[in-house]
């Protein structure tokens, strides 16, 4: 069976369950943060997207997304780069949209904060 390419910068609806404790749960939009050329397993590194709250405004690992036709989101959200995780491609449900290059650069900067790079 041929693999479907799921590319860096795509927003996909993903089933994140089961989870434990404070991990973000349920079926929700997530951002693919790894380049498809990296890795040999059918896994994607994902960052969950959650509802925007004012308290997230100055959090360095939260990247704000404004709803737009390109990203397929319906309300203001944030990408939570502190909750990045690998998921099997079978958890990916549907393509919602993409983020732009500037936002992808912000995501990479936030990942550097999270990983201390």
Model-derived segments and spans:
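Conserved functional hotspots at enzyme active or ligand-binding sites that engage polyanionic ligands
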Residues: 1-117
